[in-house]
Amino acid sequence: IIGRSDLTKSQYLYIDVFIRNIEEKGFNVLPVFTSQKPGHHEEQVIERFFISCDSLPRVSALLNLGCWYNTRPEERVVLEKLGVPVINGIILSTNQKDWEKSLVGIDIYNRSNLVAIPELAGYIEPSVAVVFDDFDHNIRIKNMIGYQMETLLGRIKNIHNLQTKPNREKKVALIYYSYPPGKENIGASYLNVLPQSILSILQRMRQEGYDTGGQPIDRAAIFNRVMDYGRNIGSWAPAEVDKLVRKGDPVLVPMEVYKEWYDKLSLKIRTEMENKWGKPEESELMVWKDSSGKSYFVIPVVKYGNIILTPQPPRGWEDNAKSLYHDPLVPPPHQYLAYYLFLKYGFHADALVHIGTHGTHEWLPGKEAGLGPDDYPEALIMDVPNIYPYIVDNVGEGLQAKRRGQAVIIDHMTPPFDKASLNPELRDLKSGISKYYDQKSKSPISSMAQFRDLVLRIKTLGLDKDLKLDTITDQNLEDIDDYLKEIEENKTPFGLHTFGVSPDEAYTKATTEAIVSMQKDLMGKDLELFREQVQKNIAKSGKEELDAFIRALNGK
């Protein structure tokens, strides 16, 4: 989809270049020009040109080159009917050199139009494609950035590949968070990754015809294999790396192979890497040498046929890893690069799946939005589809994954919610306050001993500090009682969510009531209808998570 003004203003050189290049890759192209003004019913354009008379899509993917955004309800309905991904091809108002040098990429002012609004319409993979080049003094021409066009074409091709390749032939990497290296910490924010979510995903993939090998898919087998052979190892434990190589079945990337892949990266990235970490052969993290002294990067994997389970690599040395995980400037070590380059060039992944909130890839150094090959997230994800199950209530960091990691977000539920209730000490205190008031009404003098005991317990529990009380009096004892009631009524998450599994009936009801309790503007039948709808949505959420995951793997 292209703005009609580019045709009327003779700004179509970049369109010709793009069409020729995509046709050379074996694709048919249907360029459609439409008005960029509001109120021109773009949904009719989609219906007319991209959906056949029998309601089937005529295209595998839709590329929007800086045109309209489909945020109106009627437009979004048509996009859902079309049922193919819409890629956000970004046209910048700056020139190529300024964009390449920019530390921001797309400034805040333009980010809302070029990135945020398309996100609301469901567009994915925001890709800088076109810039304005100055010609003579007063003429500016839109030009396609050559290397960005290749990446964009690769993304379109790989989406089409997911749509057409048989599931049994697809190779998928399931990537989970393992920090710190050498420890048994495998998980994500409020998500039961190991073994439950991985089990749920593998079982569904086997049902969908993916080659998951002949191994049993059960909780114990997954847990034991991942804990034995699917964890990162710190640089301080070379013996553990040797043990993994000899007893497990890791991927060994020869140093010379890594160098071939490494040389495909930009000069800027290679210079930064070697300034921080030295040359590849100087690496120590997750490096193993055979009896002849040949060096390999070790990548832990657990293989299930064409599916691999693998931990996201360490962000940096353990002694300062905490400061590195969100550091905007420090590049990742060589093994981190070897990992993602292997997934692209060695494993030939049809898709990557980053399981749970959140990993480190989208936080690597580079532009804030509108990334290019000098930016680590873009340089490592390249054109490989990135599917990312992500907790639904963490919108801000999910946007980071979309904009910097090219992620297609699959929202998953939070853990179930219920009333927090009180711990035994607070419960006894609340009971003691009630007994005190009862005794005070009968015998004020005999209740004084109870009051002194309550004051001691309140100070021991620190409630006076919570409420910033200098002294505890009979009057503010009521404030403490109200505070305990507030704590008791608070909603809190219970346990972890398992991707693809709805809460049981009791937790579904409790979570429904937690949500309904925050709805202050509904009453009577409206409130009951809202309660019923929420409960139905929670009950079917598990299946819908897996359905959305499979649609993403199908390029939909």
Name every feature range the model reports, one short phrase each:
Residues 1-556:
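Ligand/cofactor-recognition surfaces for anionic moieties
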